[in-house]
């Protein structure tokens, strides 16, 4: 089946990461619909409705070949996000979907991992992650543990996402107070980056490619380029004060050993000093795509 004969559904098309994908699909001549939260109705190729009852939405009456899922219910519990996943999988089963492309994140990997590629296992316990990452871990496990006959699931795991001409967020990277710039990490803390437009290009190639991979890592794999410290110096032209690695790790290990700090508390400290190198070479080869170095970064 050629690309123009495929029917695609984009779930969560209004998200930051998805912005611009619609124009990319239109230019490529792709037949697609969009779905997001709201009153149950259809406006052109945009359908809204209850995400927990997606499989019962009467406006999504067609069969689809591919579903691209961006939806993550921020401010909702892990259980509520899994409830949406249950409806999503039922929808895929009912509509004979052949390929589900799940927009995941590199945050699903264990904080203590030293090297990650497309074959690496993700974090086993979502409680070891905070907020956003915990939901991503739980959702990925749910999708892997509930296979649907005839449906292939691909996990697209991008690094920290940036795009042009938007305000830069320091969240999770730098705290600037009272004339001081405190790096949330040290000189070796990794921060792999990926341009949003590069993600869209990769998605188009995933859709076009007959051989589907289970995991795609989308990020710049350059070790020197991908650190918080270098990013902050280039982006904000400041030399930040680093957190003391050995001091904080000794305290964290001590509190854990006497039972004051739980494992998930300890791992969050480890996450501040993440040393993980993400090797996206297999993805670049599979998609014939150079993920390259950044030129301007905005964290999304």
PLM regions and their residue ranges:
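C-terminal amphipathic/interface module of NAD(P)-dependent oxidoreductases
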Residues: 242, 262-300
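Catalytic helix-loop patch of NAD(P)-dependent Rossmann-fold dehydrogenases
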Residues: 114-161
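Conserved Rossmann-fold NAD(P)-dependent oxidoreductase catalytic core, especially the SDR/UDP-sugar
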Residues: 87-131
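Glycine/proline-rich active-site loop of Rossmann-fold NAD(P)-dependent oxidoreductases
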Residues: 137, 162-173, 205-216
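NAD(P)-dependent short-chain dehydrogenase/reductase
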Residues: 149-191, 196
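N-terminal Rossmann NAD(P)H-binding glycine-rich loop of SDR-like oxidoreductase domains
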Residues: 8-28
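NAD(P)H-binding glycine-rich loop region in Rossmannoid oxidoreductase-like domains
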Residues: 44, 48-87, 91-94
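Mid/C-terminal beta-alpha module of Rossmann-like enzyme folds, strongest
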Residues: 202-263, 300
């Amino acid at each position: 089946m050629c690309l123009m004969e495929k029917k695609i559904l984009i779930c969560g098309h209004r998200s930051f990461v998805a912005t611009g994908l619609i124009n990319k699909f239109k230019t490529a001549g792709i037949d697609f619909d969009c779905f997001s939260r709201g009153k149950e109705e259809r406006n052109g190729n945009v359908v809204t409705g209850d995400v927990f009852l997606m499989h019962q939405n009467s406006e999504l009456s067609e069969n689809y070949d591919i579903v691209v899922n961006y939806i993550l219910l921020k401010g909702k519990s892990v259980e509520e996000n899994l409830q949406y996943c249950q409806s999503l999988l039922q929808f895929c089963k009912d509509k004979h979907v052949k390929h589900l492309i799940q927009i995941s994140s590199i945050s699903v990997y264990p904080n203590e991992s030293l090297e990650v590629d497309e074959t690496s296992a993700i974090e086993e316990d979502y409680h070891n992650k905070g907020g956003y990452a915990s939901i991503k871990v739980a959702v990925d496990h749910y999708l892997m543990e509930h296979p649907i006959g005839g449906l292939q699931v691909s996990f697209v795991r991008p690094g920290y996402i940036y795009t042009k001409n938007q305000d830069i967020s320091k969240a999770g990277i730098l705290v600037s107070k009272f004339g001081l710039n405190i790096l949330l990490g040290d000189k070796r803390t990794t921060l792999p980056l990926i341009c949003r437009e590069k993600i869209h290009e990769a998605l188009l190639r995933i859709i076009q490619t007959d051989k589907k991979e289970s995991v795609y890592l989308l990020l710049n794999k350059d070790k020197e380029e991908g650190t918080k410290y270098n990013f902050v110096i280039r982006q904000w032209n400041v030399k930040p004060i680093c957190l003391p690695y050995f001091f904080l790790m000794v305290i964290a290990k001590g509190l854990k050993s006497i039972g004051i700090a739980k494992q998930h508390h300890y791992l969050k400290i480890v996450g501040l000093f993440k040393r993980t190198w993400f090797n996206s070479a297999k993805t670049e080869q599979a998609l014939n795509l150079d993920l390259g170095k950044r030129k301007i970064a905005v964290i999304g």
